[in-house]
Amino acid sequence: MTLPAFKAYDIRGRVPDELNEDLARRIGVALAAQLDQGPVVLGHDVRLASPALQEALSAGLRASGREVIDIGLCGTEEVYFQTDHLKAAGGVMVTASHNPMDYNGMKLVREQARPISSDTGLFAIRDTVAADTAAAGEPTAAEHSRTDKTAYLEHLLSYVDRSTLKPLKLVVNAGNGGAGLIVDLLAPHLPFEFVRVFHEPDGNFPNGIPNPLLPENRDATAKAVKEHGADFGIAWDGDFDRCFFFDHTGRFIEGYYLVGLLAQAILAKQPGGKVVHDPRLTWNTVEMVEDAGGIPVLCKSGHAFIKEKMRSENAVYGGEMSAHHYFREFAYADSGMIPWLLIAELVSQSGRSLADLVEARMQKFPCSGEINFKVDDAKAAVARVMAHYGDQSPELDYTDGISADFGQWRFNLRSSNTEPLLRLNVETRGDAALLETRTQEISNLLRG
């Protein structure tokens, strides 16, 4: 039995061909064997197939004697939070996040919301399922419904001093995913006026798959910000583990510039802390962390690597340019809710707009944003780039792919962990023309 839905970090595949209720039940049995003793937290996103997949997963776990805590429709971060908060043995979020309509998936964690990835149990689960030894009898253990979100909401609100918050007007675009439910629960505790876009959870995704990284999905948020004169806008993906920002002009803010901003917000509350960041774009983050008295720590991109590094370094915050933001007190997990609360606090306390907070940083360290290339031979494409620049003797780093630092500009080139792509990021020290030249130059080399 081949199981293509098992990826390096999670399970993702087409329903029902690559992921279905029979497989979900078997995954439940196999997962039970991987976890320490204790209950397992389960939750699901808005996709139409998600409740049935969760039910089958639960049946497999309970047939293996595992108590299940069902937290129902939620965001991925809620499974992380409740797994840690309830001291459960593990947790599973049934979600395909921003994948196409016919997909579904699972994100798995063990105790303390520690990720279960390929080399920490996920492929062992796959092999058990594939060997067909994960058959299960009737469920014997209990399932409890726990939909009370009070502890989670209180934790989110603990990141900001509500007495300093101004009555900002915020556009919130849940993309018909799950974020709107949490915004509505937070709203009574905050002085903000919310303009709600695509707010109702709807697994049919009538307004398209919620993936704000796609330029065509940004228009609705940008337009609403401008039409309503909002202070800024926030858009989430389907399971709201990532959030994306738009300034008061409707301009999309690259996730890179949010990392430094959020680092400063956290370091103001936890001085001298370590901040973990990825190698794709670094100069702005390193400077802002050091200016705030923090210690930057470089780490390979990907949530499993970032979380592991944060734990080993006791880092207060971790940020990736891909809009994943991790917080120590949040079980070292990523949250799509904490960042916008911190940015709203920053805007309130500083009296400056989001645009103003990032503009100087964008000028000082302009970046290309991530550019993807489909290439037939990735090694040959990378070799062409390195041969072209080899005589310039760049400082090289291999933390994640290849990072080459030329003093006034740098690039990072890496293979995707999940797709057959090369990903390029370029940044310069305040030179937009050089950025354009080098980005075009490398793009041509990669295309051969």
Swiss-Prot record:
Cofactor binding, note field: Binds 1 Mg(2+) ion per subunit.
UniProt cross-references to InterPro entries, sorted A to Z: A-D-PHexomutase_a/b/a-I, A-D-PHexomutase_a/b/a-I/II/III, A-D-PHexomutase_a/b/a-II, A-D-PHexomutase_a/b/a-III, A-D-PHexomutase_C, A-D-PHexomutase_C_sf, A-D-PHexomutase_CS, Alpha-D-phosphohexomutase_SF
Pathway per the UniProt entry: Nucleotide-sugar biosynthesis; GDP-alpha-D-mannose biosynthesis; alpha-D-mannose 1-phosphate from D-fructose 6-phosphate: step 2/2
GO MF term set: magnesium ion binding; phosphoglucomutase activity; phosphomannomutase activity
Residues that coordinate or bind Mg(2+): 97, 237, 239, 241
The protein's required cofactors: Mg(2+)
EC number, UniProt record: 5.4.2.2, 5.4.2.8
Catalytic residues (positions): 97 (phosphoserine intermediate)
Keyword DNA-binding part of the UniProt annotation: no
Keyword terms, alphabetized: Exopolysaccharide synthesis, Isomerase, Lipopolysaccharide biosynthesis, Magnesium, Metal-binding, Phosphoprotein
Single GO BP term: lipopolysaccharide biosynthetic process
Keyword Magnesium among record annotations: yes
Catalytic reaction annotation: alpha-D-glucose 1-phosphate = alpha-D-glucose 6-phosphate; alpha-D-mannose 1-phosphate = D-mannose 6-phosphate
Function: Involved in xanthan production.
Similarity field: Belongs to the phosphohexose mutase family.
The protein's name in its UniProt record: Phosphohexose mutases
